[in-house]
Design a protein with these regions (language model features):
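Basic, ligand-binding patches in group-transfer machinery
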Residues: 1-118
């Protein structure tokens, strides 16, 4: 008898833009042991930015992308790397009222990406 693997629930990240031009990502993950990072990978290049995911007050993991971290213009795909495994992030709630030049968005495949430019 063959047993099917239980499908893994998608990881979602809520995004909040601040008035200084930074973004905060809140990610809900299962089994929060070990090292965790939010990875931004430039779609048309080989550049990656690693942001530490740290425990937040609500039990989720939080990463901050301050305005001082320069990202070249383009589209950046968002991933969560937890305990050595990497998974594509899907968008959750997005409060982009203060967004300026860095805009998280849902791709046509339902994934979370970040568009940078002026």
């Amino acid at each position: 008898m063959t047993t099917l693997a239980r499908p893994t629930a998608p990881l979602r990240a809520d995004c909040i833009a601040d008035t200084a031009g930074g973004l905060t990502f809140d990610v809900t993950v299962d089994g929060r042991g070990g090292t965790a990072h939010l990875v931004l990978r430039r779609r048309d290049g080989h550049e990656e930015v690693f942001l530490p995911l740290t425990p937040a007050a609500d039990g989720r993991l939080r990463a901050a992308l301050p305005s001082s971290v320069g990202l070249p213009e383009g589209c950046w795909d968002a991933y969560a790397r937890v305990d050595g495994g990497e998974r594509r992030l899907m968008p959750g709630v997005m409060d982009l009222t203060a967004a300026d030049g860095r805009v998280p968005y849902e791709t046509r495949h339902g994934n979370l990406s970040l568009r940078c430019g002026r």
